[in-house]
Amino acid sequence: MWKDLFVKKKKYAPLPSEQARHEVPEGVMTKCPQCKKIMYTKELIKNLRVCLSCGYHHPMPARERIASLLDDGSFREYDADMISVNPLGFPGYIEKLEEDRRKSGLNEAVVTGEGALDGHPLVIAVMDSSFRMGSMGSVVGEKITRAVERAREQQMPFLIFTASGGARMQEGVLSLMQMAKTSAALKRFSNDGGLFISVMTHPTTGGVSASFASLGDYNFAEPGALIGFAGRRVIEQTVREELPDDFQTAEFLLKHGQLDAVIHRHELKETLAVVLDLHQKGGEEGWWRN
């Protein structure tokens, strides 16, 4: 027994297997699609999901976007429990919606509500491309329309951040009619003098780009955002011409007069606060464009 107490200890420790050494928990690291650099996801989030190496603007979840812009504790969400059904009986659609709800933590591809930005009250809508690629179905269109109507009733500015692949094919014509419905609501809002600010993020395409995304009194975009209706390849085949390398980027649209400004994400809050300052009315008159 005494001999066992003084057994010489081994001078090595077991090494992890080759597979274990290369396994990193999912979500800890993020690879930039532009510069291919790998960075800690926590550091990327701290930097508002702007690449620390090349400045690429990664997609930003809707709730992160709201938290980064609005004053602490000011946000009150609208229509949080509104969810899509399957009006056309499209095979597998309900299952895909449930999967996206589980992965994104959202009930739909847009979050709407009211809050304050640097003390300025407003109504806000933020689309999230992690839910059905931000596609616009009947619920997305309804939530945006209701948000615009509330902004009109309460005489507050309306701010939207778009990120979408276009109309949702699983809902057919019901998704296409949202283009007209949202645009009509914005027309009524504009006729009453309402201030509408649209910020297009990557990507803003299809029926969203062809409707409410482009109707702002101010049309802004983030750097490098893909903005357009049809895809590049479809357009090239139609016009039988090779398109410029920067075609359908935010910078291309700015150069051709379709945007008012391309704004870095780090400067967005300050810029929006300045715009709201310019359009504020005193007393009880509210916040109006005119």
Curated annotation (Swiss-Prot):
Keyword field: ATP-binding, Cytoplasm, Fatty acid biosynthesis, Fatty acid metabolism, Lipid biosynthesis, Lipid metabolism, Metal-binding, Nucleotide-binding, Transferase, Zinc, Zinc-finger
Cofactor binding description: Binds 1 zinc ion per subunit.
Role description: Component of the acetyl coenzyme A carboxylase (ACC) complex. Biotin carboxylase (BC) catalyzes the carboxylation of biotin on its carrier protein (BCCP) and then the CO(2) group is transferred by the transcarboxylase to acetyl-CoA to form malonyl-CoA.
The enzyme's E.C. designation: 2.1.3.15
Positions bound to Zn(2+): C32, C35, C51, C54
Record lineage: Bacteria, Bacillati, Bacillota, Bacilli, Bacillales
InterPro entries, sorted: AcCoA_carboxyl_beta, Acetyl_CoA_COase_Trfase_b_su, ClpP/crotonase-like_dom_sf, COA_CT_N, Znf-ACC
Family of this protein: Belongs to the AccD/PCCB family.
Catalyzed reactions: N(6)-carboxybiotinyl-L-lysyl-[protein] + acetyl-CoA = N(6)-biotinyl-L-lysyl-[protein] + malonyl-CoA
Cellular component annotations (GO), alphabetically ordered: acetyl-CoA carboxylase complex
HAMAP family registered for this protein in UniProt: AcetylCoA_CT_beta (MF_01395)
Class of enzymatic activity (EC top level): transferase
Cellular compartment(s): Cytoplasm
Record organism: Geobacillus kaustophilus (strain HTA426)
The protein's name in its UniProt record: Acetyl-coenzyme A carboxylase carboxyl transferase subunit beta
GO BP term (any one): fatty acid biosynthetic process
Cofactors required: Zn(2+)
Domain CoA carboxyltransferase N-terminal: 28-290
NCBIfam families: accD
ATP-binding found in the keyword field: yes
Pathway: Lipid metabolism; malonyl-CoA biosynthesis; malonyl-CoA from acetyl-CoA: step 1/1
GO MF: acetyl-CoA carboxylase activity; ATP binding; carboxyl- or carbamoyltransferase activity; zinc ion binding
Quaternary context: Acetyl-CoA carboxylase is a heterohexamer composed of biotin carboxyl carrier protein (AccB), biotin carboxylase (AccC) and two subunits each of ACCase subunit alpha (AccA) and ACCase subunit beta (AccD).
